[in-house]
Design a protein with these regions (language model features):
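N-terminal binding-site loop/beta-alpha segment at the start of enzyme catalytic domains
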Residues: 1-26, 141-143
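Short, well-ordered amphipathic alpha-helices
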Residues: 7-17, 44-48, 75-76, 97
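CE4/NodB-like, metal-dependent polysaccharide N-deacetylase domain
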Residues: 41-61, 77-81, 103
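Structured loop/turn residues at beta-strand edges in well-structured enzyme cores
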Residues: 21-24, 51-54, 82, 106, ...
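A short, structured active-site edge motif that brings together acidic residues
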Residues: 22-36, 57-64, 91
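Ser/Thr-glycine-rich phosphate-binding loops at phosphate-binding pockets of nucleotides
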Residues: 1-4, 56, 89-90, 166
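Beta/alpha (TIM)-barrel catalytic core signal, keyed to glycine-rich beta->alpha loops juxtaposed to Asp/Glu
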Residues: 63-207
Length: 207
């Protein structure tokens, strides 16, 4: 879907060669998509070929769909073969997980969902965490047209000012204090540094 596996693989190989970075210090996540669930072996083999980095650290099912259990069970076989090291899900919620989890052998290590202050997932997050599964959020800063609105929210700006940080840092810290892994994206070096600088303040309540 994203069409970047070849570029990611090339970047990993270059980094390993140029800087001596061990492969085990790099963690690559990729996905297979509902349109590929009927032929998961072909999708996984293609991902392995395009990445060309020996193995995939984690593979996710991108969204529930027909043959999702079948696809996941094939992914389990690749784990047994050492070609995939861990498995996860994306866009799975309480109802879908309740039906899905009893049908598979390897509990997903991670569930990746959209989570931000306008989409808080107050019921889903604890449900997933109570299964012993890590929650990761995509679009933590709003996404889908909400980023500017979210970062300009008066309440968030007030909280940010009280801590001497940005609204984006408040949002990311809120996620971290809920035990959620965040994956903000940016090509702006200043924003990247800001997104990493989350540990010098504490929010009072993150329920």
């Amino acid at each position: 879907m994203y069409g970047n596996e070849e570029a990611v693989g090339e970047g990993v190989r270059r980094g390993m060669e140029a800087y001596g970075i061990p492969r085990e210090d790099i963690f690559v996540i990729t996905k297979i998509y509902p349109s590929q669930f009927s032929e998961p072996e072909a999708a996984i083999d293609m991902a392995l070929q395009k990445l060309d980095i020996g193995y995939i650290d984690m593979m996710l099912l991108h969204h529930p769909g027909a043959n999702d259990v079948k696809a996941y069970k094939v992914m389990e076989q690749y784990v047994e073969a050492g070609k995939i090291h861990s498995l996860g899900l994306s866009n799975w919620y309480v109802e879908e997980l309740t039906e899905f989890l009893p049908q598979v052998d390897i509990t997903p290590a991670l569930v990746q969902n959209e989570i931000h202050p306008y989409y808080q997932e107050q019921d889903v997050v604890p449900f997933i965490q109570n299964q012993g599964v890590v929650v990761q959020c995509w679009y933590p800063l709003g996404g889908r047209g909400y980023t500017s609105e979210l970062l300009g929210n008066d309440t968030l700006k007030t909280i940010a000012a009280s801590h001497g940080v940005s609204a984006a840092q408040v949002i990311l810290r809120w996620d971290l204090q809920r035990g959620i892994v965040v994956i903000p994206g940016s090509s702006n070096p200043e924003h990247i540094r800001e997104n990493l600088d989350l540990f010098g303040f504490q929010l009072r309540s993150c329920a």
